[in-house]
Amino acid sequence: ARIKALGIKGDKKHSAEAYLQSFIITHAEKFLNDKGRQIIGWDEMLEGGLAPNSTVMSWRGESGGIEAAKQHHDVIMSPNTYLYFDYYQSKDVENEPEAIGGYLPIERVYSYEPMPKSLTPEEQKYIKGVQANLWTEYIPTFSQVEYMELPRMAALAEVQWTMPAKKNYEDFLKRLPGLVDVYDVYKYNYATHVFDVNAVFTPNPQDGTLDVTL
């Protein structure tokens, strides 16, 4: 009824419902701006067009953040494939606390680069930072919150404050034990997968031997 009353029509780009969403967000933004506040929301806000001063949190990959930055809107990068800490830290899910799914090892978190190369230097100025998300539908205790966050939070910190040319995962691993000592002092519950020994087995059919790479 509201769509009809406002005379909103869909087109090839967006549905009428998406345009109604944009209308509501723009109305809400004006109210908040009048109170000295700014609006911020997930990248679904792009559907139907953004309100003028919106800040976008890009969680469905990076495309929403890229689109918003090209429109000169502030962006916080939060792609689920790199920064959703409610994903499992190990593939051995049978021995892990229950999680929503997915797989996000600390190495992948560390590898994230929040400045898309598809943006110009001027457009990159609208990327204000990154954010990890930890939804707690499957997390009943604060101790498990710590487990899901640590030490992935340390990798997130370096994503934010280290320039790409200076990032070095091997060096990060060398420094991590010092931080883990702090975790121990405060009795934080942290995951230890990063310290596991990973072995690759390569059979040699010619002589029946087995190469093991650690």
Model-derived features: positions:
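Acidic/polar loop patches that form or flank catalytic/metal-binding clefts of enzymes
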Residues: 33-43, 75-79, 163-169, 191-192
